[in-house]
């Protein structure tokens, strides 16, 4: 599959500690694009980008301290609620083997399914799964046909 996915979807993940985000995701090749630190008036906002020949992956994080738990919608849930329940964040890469080696070397404890080849609906690809320090479920995968044109 060679057609990259082109869309304008913005993923924003609410977290209480942006330094944990920086440490974890930088080990997977993400770089900081924007870093607005929390202050007395406002929570912080962090944008990270992972460059790949298939296209860049951008993730956005909001929060940075305990005030994130007071967000208008999410405040109805306990602080201990696992982040991202029933959601999979899928990140395509042209270099799945190299990325897996990086993850295995630096973040092995977060891998919840090792790299393996899968077959489904006529597609064959490799992927692996991780859970980040906040509980967001991440799938790193080779590009397959999701209907992109």
Place the predicted regions along the sequence by residue.
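Vicinal oxygen chelate
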Residues: 1-10, 31-94, 100-131, 142-149
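Long, hydrophobic N-terminal alpha-helical segment
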Residues: 7, 11-23, 27-29
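Helix N-cap motif at beta-to-alpha junctions
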Residues: 17-19, 94-97
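Short alpha-helical segments used as structural interaction elements across diverse proteins
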Residues: 19, 123-126, 136
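Conserved active-site tyrosine of GNAT-family acetyltransferases
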Residues: 21-26, 103, 132-135
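Active-site-proximal beta-strands of protease catalytic cores
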Residues: 139
């Amino acid at each position: 599959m060679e057609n990259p996915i082109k869309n304008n979807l913005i993923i924003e993940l609410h977290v209480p500690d942006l330094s944990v985000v920086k440490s974890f995701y930088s080990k997977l090749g993400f770089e900081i694009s924007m870093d607005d630190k929390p202050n007395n008036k406002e929570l912080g906002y962090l944008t990270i980008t992972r460059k790949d020949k298939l296209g860049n992956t951008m993730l956005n994080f909001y929060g940075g301290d305990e005030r994130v738990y007071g967000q208008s919608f999410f405040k109805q849930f306990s602080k201990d609620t696992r982040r991202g329940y029933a959601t999979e964040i899928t990140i395509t890469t042209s270099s799945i083997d190299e990325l897996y080696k990086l993850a295995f070397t630096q973040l092995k404890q977060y891998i919840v399914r090792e790299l393996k080849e899968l077959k489904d609906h006529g597609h064959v690809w490799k992927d692996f799964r991780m859970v980040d320090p906040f509980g967001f479920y991440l799938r790193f995968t080779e590009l397959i046909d999701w209907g992109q044109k």
